[in-house]
């Protein structure tokens, strides 16, 4: 008598466990990058910096003297429209240096050239990217603990891959 009830009970248990296997998985697959809709352009004595800002993201142009990095630094602050005041500062500077304590660096290819990504104290998220080669002098600085950074880090890299640097003649 108990056998006819066992099959429906097993099927019901299986159906209840099935949705548990359908959750979001974190894989190495990149997130879909928003389509760039606007080019942010800022110029200074050293040249012109351009970057594509995706739809749904905000930016602020920062002329020379408006960043705390140096009087000559100029660039663009970029952030997703997430309600956070934390941003990525993308800028040109005549000098760039960081503290080496707890720093691990990895080499990336961005905007057709090499960039050095700096990770502090075992963080999975980078704190800075320093462009080399044709884009030397361009730096991206971020707060790796910003609430949106971990979820949208791939999108940030896609944005930073659109950097164009035109040195002054």
Residue ranges and their predicted role:
Residues 1-10:
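Bacterial N-terminal signal peptides that target proteins for export
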Residues 35-41, 72-76, 109-118:
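Short, hydrophobic/aromatic-rich segments at coil-to-beta transitions
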Residues 28-49:
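N-terminal low-complexity, Pro/Thr/Ser-rich intrinsically disordered segments
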Residues 95-151, 157, 168-169:
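Signature of long, low-cysteine stretches enriched in small and polar/charged residues
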Residues 43-97, 120-129:
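Secretory pathway targeting signatures of secreted, lumenal, and periplasmic proteins
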Residues 23-25:
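Bacterial signal peptide processing site
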Residues 10-16:
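Hydrophobic helical h-region of N-terminal Sec-dependent signal peptides
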Residues 18-21:
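C-terminal motif of bacterial Sec signal peptides marking the signal peptidase cleavage site
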């Amino acid at each position: 008598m108990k056998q006819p009830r066992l099959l429906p009970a097993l099927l019901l248990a299986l159906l209840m466990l099935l949705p548990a296997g359908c959750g979001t998985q974190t894989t190495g697959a990149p997130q879909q990058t928003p389509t760039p809709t606007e080019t942010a352009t800022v110029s200074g004595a050293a040249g012109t910096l351009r970057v594509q800002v995706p739809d749904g993201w905000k930016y602020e142009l920062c002329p020379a003297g408006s960043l705390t990095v140096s009087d000559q630094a100029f660039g663009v602050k970029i952030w997703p429209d997430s309600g956070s005041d934390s941003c990525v500062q993308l800028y040109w500077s005549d000098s760039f240096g960081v503290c080496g304590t707890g720093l691990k660096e990895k080499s990336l290819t961005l905007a057709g050239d090499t960039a050095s990504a700096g990770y502090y104290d075992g963080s999975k998220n980078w704190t800075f990217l320093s462009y080399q080669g044709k884009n030397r002098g361009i730096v991206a600085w971020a707060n790796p603990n910003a609430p949106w950074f971990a979820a949208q880090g791939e999108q940030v890299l896609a944005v930073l891959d659109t950097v164009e640097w035109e040195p002054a003649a």
